Amino acid sequence: MLARRKPVLPALTINPTIAEGPSPTSEGASEAHLVDLQKKLEELDLDEQQRKRLEAFLTQKAKVGELKDDDFERISELGAGNGGVVTKARHRPSGLIMARKLIHLEIKPAVRNQIIRELQVLHECNSPYIVGFYGAFYSDGEISICMEHMDGGSLDQVLKEAKRIPEDILGKVSIAVLRGLAYLREKHQIMHRDVKPSNILVNSRGEIKLCDFGVSGQLIDSMANSFVGTRSYMSPERLQGTHYSVQSDIWSMGLSLVELAIGRYPIPPPDAKELEASFGRPVVDGADGEPHSVSPRPRPPGRPISGHGMDSRPAMAIFELLDYIVNEPPPKLPSGVFSSDFQEFVNKCLIKNPAERADLKLLTNHAFIKRSEGEDVDFAGWLCRTLRLKQPSTPTRTAV
């Protein structure tokens, strides 16, 4: 079902040395390293703040040295999913706080080594819209992927606190996701393969970044049978096992935006009573002002229309859900509560035929994105209020 991806050869090799005191050789290598990285950053369209933050991250990273299990102090668990457990950890030698993802896999040493090799491509992924990567290693049956810690967590966690995420905030999210996907495609010929709210991370500085993208074909194959859940963000063509491309990432982004906007996974679609409970007033659909329609197909047994709030019905069985995605009309935003630009943007993402679905270039130039780029939105302030985080002393409006 998953297409084998051609391995991406890294354009730049990063082998940080352990800082054990001043050494002309190591210092010279480190400086040459940073000069090389700065040249890479100059190729990107960055503002001054983004450039300084990336340079600061890379300077810190150059001092980290080889990552080893014994050097980590576990602080807390950040989340768990199909891929494994993510913990907040302190790297003792450097003092840096990192997010450490532990993936337990029963695999042969040769496969394990290939995964670690393929993950090294992440060293090359330096963008304001991609979560920073410190390194990966294997220890005691687990692969550890060490990343930049994002103190706002993922958007699925933010949604639990916010209940619904406002359109102006989602405008900034859309810009960051599009720029992140474009960076992966243009600079590294990588598809994300797993765009969803839990893989969009945010922080109190107002940054929005993608994580968990598919750089390792071997890791994807090794985890292919580990899916357990009640929802899917995969496009219809991917579920049908046909050829898929970055257009599939566009579908996943559109589905994620609908979920974040209405407050719950949008399949099956919410009925009028659910929407009224969520938005606090009747929600209409269409130009003629009719109440928002329910699913065009009779609901499966045990899933009656319910007026007891969002997501109150039993979840669909996974086979029902996948059948719905492939055979039923795609989700859409209700009218009357979102701008026509936002509705149209999402509709273009959720066209079932990938050949007709909007591509990255079209979406980047869409009226919704152009309007969002021009809006002064205090994303950092909104996030800190929502999650009750302490805002940095030098707050930013948004890092997008």
From Swiss-Prot:
The modification Phosphoserine is found at residues 23, 222, 226, 293, 295, 306. It comes from the Eukaryota. Residues 282-310 are annotated as: Disordered. Its cofactor is Mg(2+). It is found in: Cytoplasm; Membrane. GO terms for biological process: epithelial cell proliferation involved in lung morphogenesis; ERBB2-ERBB3 signaling pathway; ERK1 and ERK2 cascade; face development; heart development; insulin-like growth factor receptor signaling pathway; lung morphogenesis; MAPK cascade. The modification N-acetylmethionine is found at residue 1. Expressed abundantly in the adult brain and muscle. It is a peripheral membrane protein. MAPKK is itself dependent on Ser/Thr phosphorylation for activity catalyzed by MAP kinase kinase kinases (RAF or MEKK1). Phosphorylated by MAP2K1/MEK1. The modification Phosphothreonine is found at residues 394, 396. GO terms for molecular function: ATP binding; MAP kinase kinase activity; MAP-kinase scaffold activity; metal ion binding; molecular adaptor activity; PDZ domain binding; protein serine kinase activity; protein serine/threonine kinase activator activity. Keywords: Acetylation, ATP-binding, Cytoplasm, Kinase, Magnesium, Membrane, Metal-binding, Nucleotide-binding, Phosphoprotein, Serine/threonine-protein kinase, Transferase, Tyrosine-protein kinase. Residues 72-369 form the Protein kinase domain. The keyword Cell wall biogenesis/degradation does not apply. The active site is at residue 194. Its EC number is 2.7.12.2. ATP binds at residues 78-86, 101. GO terms for cellular component: cell cortex; cell-cell junction; cytoplasm; cytoplasmic side of plasma membrane; cytosol; early endosome; endoplasmic reticulum; focal adhesion. The keyword Cell cycle does not apply. Belongs to the protein kinase superfamily. STE Ser/Thr protein kinase family. MAP kinase kinase subfamily. This is Dual specificity mitogen-activated protein kinase kinase 2. It comes from Rattus norvegicus.
